[in-house]
Amino acid sequence: QTARQKGFIPVLTTNGTLLSQKKELLDALPHKIQISPHAHEGNDRKNADTYINKVMTFAKEAAAKGCIIVLRLWNEGGYNQMNEAILQLIAQHQPAPWTERKDGWKLAENLFIEHDNMFSWPDSKQAAYDEPEVFCYALRNQIGVLADGTVVPCCLDHDGELALGNLFELSLEEILSSPRAQAIYRGFTNHTAVEGLCQRCGFSIVSKRFRR
């Protein structure tokens, strides 16, 4: 609500595991919520039926209230062995027919499935990519906020390796104006990754085609 009042169009991205515990979100829905069921297989988790049941219960209620819900299967060419099972579980909650789109399906009003190619998540233990030019929307169009209030450049930093500050201690303006945050922003403006973790992220390579 505060974001809307300040003129922002809030979009949240989540793996959906905590949505059933955050029902108050239904009373202050953002413009869009992007939920990533592909993370379930990628993180080697079990009980997909329980997970999808919780995700779809929330998704359908949020969509009915006008929030755009996008269920993302961004794992083509990678951890996608469970995709068919996940689609079948989704269909139990929102039966076909679905309207086919170039990047997935429209299941119902405000409810979509989107598929795309898999990219490598950043891993500080891996070697850096040898790429002369990269780009990322981190701190430009998006930030990540972990469950404890830690702000990171994007949602791929799930361990908080690039912690920029905590919203329970600092304002977002203070966090984004910090020297480290500004260095990351300027780096991607110049098509370079200044942080080691970003140098090991496959998305910064994929997204360079969107650079601006």
Spans of model-derived segments:
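Structural motif
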Residues: 30-32, 140, 162
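Radical SAM/AdoMet-radical enzyme domain recognition
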Residues: 1-102
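Short, flexible, glycine/charge-rich loop motifs used to bind or transfer phosphoryl groups or to couple energy/partner
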Residues: 21-24, 132-133, 188-191
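Flexible mid-to-C-terminal extensions adjoining Fe-S/redox cofactors in radical SAM and related proteins
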Residues: 156-212
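Short clusters of hydrophobic/aromatic residues that line enzyme substrate/ligand-binding pockets
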Residues: 19, 136, 164-167
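A C-terminal junction/extension of Radical SAM enzymes
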Residues: 61-154, 159, 193-208
